[in-house]
Amino acid sequence: MNYLAHARRHLLTPGKITGPGAEAGPYFLAGVALPDWLSIIDRKVRTRSESAAKLLSDSDPRVVAVARGIIQHHFDDRWFHQTEEFLVLSSRFAVELRQYLDIEQGAQPGFVGHILVELLLDATLTAEQPDLLDQYYAAMDLLDPECVENVVNRVSKTPTSLVRPLIPRFIRERFLYDYAEDAKLLWRLNHVMKRVGLPQLPESLLNWLPTARERVTHARDGLMSGQHEDPPWDHWSNQSTTSP
């Protein structure tokens, strides 16, 4: 699951992100995004639910919101990756991508198929409600990056100083808008390939992306079937109160 799919339900909840008493709302969105942000800057930095739960009783509501967002992220990923639609689409994409990718040069069609389902789902959700991305970035713009980084360093065993500069760059680049167009999507995908050390994807993929996009749009409801489910907050709150 990618950024907007993680955030969508919370953006649509009146007063959750904006409005009276919602000052911590953007920090929940930051928590929901954090595991994906960390995959960009340093995969050795991990924010696990068990560690985040220890902060649920913190006196700072922003810290609590980030911790809740981290737990929500991992909960969402678990149900999402178990949906029939994700399993079928990612597997089919992996098979079809083999005719475009150079396996002998190290290309990994399974990895590409996996992330394509997630990015194209974000594109589908954006097309449904174009203002959602505007709301998302507006909420992110309210963050204190130092506060978010401090939470990461309390949760992760590996410290980092890279979260603080990443957040304004993430807001400035607004790359989630690029998923709507196949050429821009391919360009963004090749940024990912470079970052993880995989071969660049060929331009011939532009001939295949429209059918992939159409199938993800068709599977949208199944892919989002668990979107209204919540983590077992009582369980995680107990972890907070029993932690030293």
Residue ranges and their predicted role:
Residues 31-40, 114-127, 187-191:
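Short, hydrophobic/amphipathic alpha-helical patches that form generic packing surfaces
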